[in-house]
Structures are given as C-alpha cells and as structure tokens.
C-alpha cells in the first residue's frame, strides 16, 4: 500500500501575535514537504509541492511539527466515548494556555481509563484549516501524527529552527522526547544542558538533520546519526498516534469508500474507462432519439391511416 506523508506548515499564530502582524491569509499558497513510500520504511520520492500537485497514494498521513503540540500527562478519566472530550477538558483545563474550545485534544494510543496517559493539545482552528485546505485540493488525510511524542527510550534530535540560519547562534535546536514529555530548545545558552540529564541515558537515540549535524556533534561531544527530514517523516508516520479524534475524526467508512472510488475513477489509469462510458452514454442517447423518432413516425402513420379510413367511410 502506497503511503504519502506530508509535513504541515508551521503554525505562525504566536509569531504573528508577537510582531502585531495580521493573521495569515486563509487563501495563501501552501507548500508541503512530502515523502512517499511503499512500505513505510524506505522512501521512494520526496520534495515539496502545493496540495493539488502532491502525489496520490492509498494512505495519507499529515505530520504536525513538535513545536505545534503541547503535552499533558493525566489520569485518563472513565467516561463514555461521547463524553470523553468533556471529561478531558475538566481534568486539564487549568493547564491549558488557551480557552478549551479553541484547543483540539487527542488521547495516546492504547490508553487505559483510570491509568496515566498522555494527551496531545493542538490549536483546533489551525489544524482544521490545514485539513480543509488539503481536502479542497483532493488530498484526504487519513491520520494526523506528531513529529515527536513522549517515549522510551529517550530520543534527541538536532535540527535547524524554522527560517533560521544554521550558522547563527540559536539557529540549531534540540528536540528532546522522553517519558516525561517533549521539549524543543535552542542549543545556545544553558537550557538544553539543563533539560538533558547528565550524563544522558545510555539508551538515548541521538539523531540530527544534515544541516545541524556539525553543531550537534560539537554540543554533544560525540557522533550522531544523520537523519534527513524524509526519514523522520516516515518515522513519525509509523507511530501509533492519530490526532484525528473527536470533532476532527475522519469521515465514516461509507463516505470514505465513495470518495476513494471517485478519486480512483478520476485517475489517469481510468481514463479509457471514462471515455468508454462516455461513448456508451452518447450511443444510448442517440439510440433513444432514433427510437423516439421511429415511434413518432409510426404513430403518425397510424393516425393518417385512420383519417383516410374515416374519409372513405
């Protein structure tokens, strides 16, 4: 089964607020970094494109950047599915930085009621806007996953901050994901060293993007495995997470089946079938018109015969 994994653009709300800029235009042209894979492990193609130009695939996964997800660890309330979101809000409302109605929540996979579980929080309007923009271009997202999530063993990934110069101070950041949460901090200053236990756990998996590898090895004092963005997107796609829960849950199976059938029917491979069906419809219309014309002539002939018989009588 072919898989398309795309990275959602960075949520710029906080940056716009800080600079008193206007909110981004909903109709702006979005460019998506993407990768395709047949097995979810090795990528076949990669690049960036507008939504309408993205490759088609059997499954589409959207990845949310680590800085666009907040994490809350709670005791999962015991509530029916229809009331679970309200129960979650009741537990973490005081910890939310914004109004609960503007936040989308998602529960960790395999979470058990009454036990500790992680809840992901994302700006609802922003995520809905991104999903709508993709859907309008014919890209239907099956799953939404975080780029990083609380996990064991710990993982540290070095990469360049959005729109930053990798050679500039603070250009390189570290995303530290472990059992106690996820945090992304700049390498300059002491916050990164304070965040990571010293010495780091021996089981820690260290990776870096190609542009951040040198800074990562200087900071860490040890070699790191280079992981391009394409591999990192596939890694995120293999997780069990799915942020499409509650009000953002995907459509029903019936609607999805109809949508997938329509998408397949409009694909280039089905063009001969479409042409054949169109020709069949045209032939049927022409045939019906000829039959109607023939029937009309027969009726008129009978009418003329009856009129002639009446005159003779």
Language model features with spans:
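Hydrophobic/aromatic-enriched cytosolic interaction surfaces used to assemble or bind macromolecules
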Residues: 1-313
């Amino acid at each position: 089964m072919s898989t398309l994994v795309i990275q959602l653009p960075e949520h710029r709300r906080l940056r716009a607020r800080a600079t008193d800029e206007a909110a981004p235009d909903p109709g702006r042209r979005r460019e998506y970094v993407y990768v395709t894979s047949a097995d979810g492990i090795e990528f076949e193609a990669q690049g960036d494109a507008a939504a309408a130009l993205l490759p088609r695939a059997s499954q589409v996964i959207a990845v949310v950047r680590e800085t666009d997800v907040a994490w809350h660890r709670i005791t999962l309330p015991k509530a029916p599915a229809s009331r679970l979101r309200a129960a979650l809000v009741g537990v973490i409302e005081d910890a939310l930085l914004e109004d609960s109605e503007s936040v989308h929540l998602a529960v960790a996979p395999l979470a058990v009621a009454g036990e500790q579980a992680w809840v992901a929080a994302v700006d609802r309007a922003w995520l809905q806007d991104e999903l709508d923009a993709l859907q309008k271009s014919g890209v239907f997202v099956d799953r939404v996953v975080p780029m990083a999530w609380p996990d064991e063993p710990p993982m540290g990934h070095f990469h360049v901050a959005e729109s930053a110069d990798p050679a500039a101070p603070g250009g390189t950041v570290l995303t530290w994901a472990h059992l106690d949460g996820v945090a992304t901090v700049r390498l300059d200053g002491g916050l990164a060293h304070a965040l990571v236990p010293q010495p780091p756990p021996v089981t820690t998996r260290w990776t870096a993007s190609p542009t951040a590898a040198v800074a990562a090895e200087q900071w860490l004092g040890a070699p790191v495995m280079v992981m391009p963005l394409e591999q990192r997107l596939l890694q995120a796609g293999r997780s069990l997470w799915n942020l499409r829960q509650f009000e953002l849950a995907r459509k029903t199976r019936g609607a999805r089946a109809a949508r997938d059938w329509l998408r397949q029917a409009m694909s280039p491979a089905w063009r001969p079938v479409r042409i054949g069906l169109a020709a069949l419809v045209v032939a049927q219309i022409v045939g019906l018109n000829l039959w109607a014309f023939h029937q009309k002539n027969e009726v008129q002939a009978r009418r003329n015969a009856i009129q002639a018989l009446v005159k003779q009588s």
